[in-house]
Amino acid sequence: MSGDGATEQAAEYVPEKVKKAEKKLEENPYDLDAWSTLIREAQNQPIDKARKTYERLVAQFPSSGRFWKLYIEAEIKAKNYDKVEKLFQRCLMKVLHIDLWKCYLSYVRETKGKLPSYKEKMAQAYDFALDKIGMEIMSYQIWVDYINFLKGVEAVGSYAENQRITAVRRVYQRGCVNPMINIEQLWRDYNKYEEGINIHLAKKMIEDRSRDYMNARRVAKEYETVMKGLDRNAPSVPPQNTPQEAQQVDMWKKYIQWEKSNPLRTEDQTLITKRVMFAYEQCLLVLGHHPDIWYEAAQYLEQSSKLLAEKGDMNNAKLFSDEAANIYERAISTLLKKNMLLYFAYADYEESRMKYEKVHSIYNRLLAIEDIDPTLVYIQYMKFARRAEGIKSGRMIFKKAREDTRTRHHVYVTAALMEYYCSKDKSVAFKIFELGLKKYGDIPEYVLAYIDYLSHLNEDNNTRVLFERVLTSGSLPPEKSGEIWARFLAFESNIGDLASILKVEKRRFTAFKEEYEGKETALLVDRYKFMDLYPCSASELKALGYKDVSRAKLAAIIPDPVVAPSIVPVLKDEVDRKPEYPKPDTQQMIPFQPRHLAPPGLHPVPGGVFPVPPAAVVLMKLLPPPICFQGPFVQVDELMEIFRRCKIPNTVEEAVRIITGGAPELAVEGNGPVESNAVLTKAVKRPNEDSDEDEEKGAVVPPVHDIYRARQQKRIR
């Protein structure tokens, strides 16, 4: 019994690193480091135990060819071929990843070899793969494997032999005009193949294909350049807004734009569209959580469909039109199930195709998701219903929206304005606003929308009554009424007399007595301001303690760095305006605290060490390790001082004079020595250096039997 308990404990044992990884995934399901830990652990376990981890992995990253391949290889290793085929059915058509497709072909080749129909199945698999992934820049090996497979097929009789030659030639000719790496080698192999069949016919066959091959080879070089730097194995994660991600997005878009520019210079619109869509498919494997990529792909298909329809190719036009709808469907069914932008774009696309029932199903599908705010969905749904089916249909959607407890006040504003603008019925709009006021009377934004509507109608009495109702009913908390009071004052300033203005100001001061105690003049600013014009300078407004309620509200709604500066004028005088300069992020700075007596090789300031450049890393690997050098160590300061004191000569003659201590005596004619012994033996005296006593007494005389000098003199003679 104790042995069985130990076995169960061993089976249930979970390593600490796995527990930490699981905890990280609870906080962030897209933590790639945590997933790497789980993958390594799964690879060391039996497939029956690891399958759950793999299923979680491909569910979290359904577009990652690398992760699907890991899962499939684990099943192949366990010889679970029925499960392998089901996995291929789940991922192969959706994930156009070159390594995954190579794995598929390898699986068919290894497992179907003993079947009677192996040759047909293998040929179908290769044709299927080339049709889907043949435009991949790294697809050379698939083309070559297919050709070698066809060459190895046994052919009995001349008819079968001709069939095989035709099949091989067809694949060669398709491959030689397809831009990819190693296209030159494929072309050379094709030349040899044709020459091996019929050398006389080969010349014409090669000449016919040569121009297309040269074009494909040119494009292949551009293709390789534009794909350089793309991280094509990165799993698709939600936007992180990092510089590295922005760089990858930019590179992917450049690749797609390059394909759109028609580098092959072909007139076949179908081929252009297929190549562009292949680029989009490759991009979506990595950037599947970016809605703009999905939308642009669908838009491109829609444009191509219209272009083909204009040319009369109705079959391909319909094919691309349906494929555009399929792009939207894939997006909202997989990675972007809650992305309203794509739902709305999908609905508009189907509306343009007059498929209204489909549009209703799209909106209802989004509304069925429980953990979303459906307010904007109902608003767009109402607008569609009014456009496509009339005002009555829009009213039905509004009724449905009122019954949904998740909706907010915006649907009432939309419905009221829709009635006013479309049915021209002010009374219906007025009733909707009144109905909403009972439910949302404590929300300033709704009250302001109602006020704007009445102001637009120029109904002064009704507007004034609404102000009084809202401000005296007690439904609106005092802390939320600031903007209503500001709007009331602006209203009276525009249409009322001075007495009514002063009355509103007094009531407003009473409502905010604690906040504006001693700052009565600040309230005066609102009486005289207009839009972004103020009766005081910015510094004076600060001194008054003035606070613009409407501006503060707008700043809270609009993201400051992107939109606010262009919409909200800055309260600055011309004198106060100073040029904006780029400033460092001081929060990231490290205090300057140099180490005292820092050891050699260590940066004196903490945090000052930086990564070595790649070229320097290579050099450092070639050099011996530091422990091999025991000295002597150069005194850098003294060495630099010597360099500083050195006088660099401007001419060769001056350099010779400094080195030798005097001008050289050159022999003009005869066999005499070039230099005198006095010059050669004169000691070199450095500037700014004390002379030794021995040097002052005289020059050092060279040895009598100086063999080196004797040989030099013989050469000169």
From Swiss-Prot:
Modified sites of kind N-acetylserine: 2
Compartments where found: Nucleus
Region (Disordered): 684-705
HAT repeat extents: 45-77, 79-110, 117-152, 163-196, 221-261, 271-303, 319-352, 354-387, 458-494
GO-annotated molecular function: mRNA binding
GO cellular component entries: nucleus
Entry keyword set: Acetylation, mRNA processing, Nucleus, Phosphoprotein, Repeat
Record InterPro entries: HAT (IPR003107), Rna14-like (IPR045243), Suf (IPR008847), TPR-like_helical_dom_sf (IPR011990)
Gene Ontology process terms (BP): mRNA 3'-end processing
In-chain residues carrying the UniProt-annotated modification Phosphoserine: 691
PANTHER family for this protein: CLEAVAGE STIMULATION FACTOR SUBUNIT 3, RNA CLEAVAGE STIMULATION FACTOR
Chain's role: One of the multiple factors required for polyadenylation and 3'-end cleavage of mammalian pre-mRNAs.
Subunit structure: Homodimer. The CSTF complex is composed of CSTF1 (50 kDa subunit), CSTF2 (64 kDa subunit) and CSTF3 (77 kDa subunit). CSTF3 directly interacts with CSTF1 and CSTF2. Interacts with FIP1L1.
Protein name: Cleavage stimulation factor subunit 3
Organism from which the protein derives: Pongo abelii
Gene that this sequence comes from: CSTF3
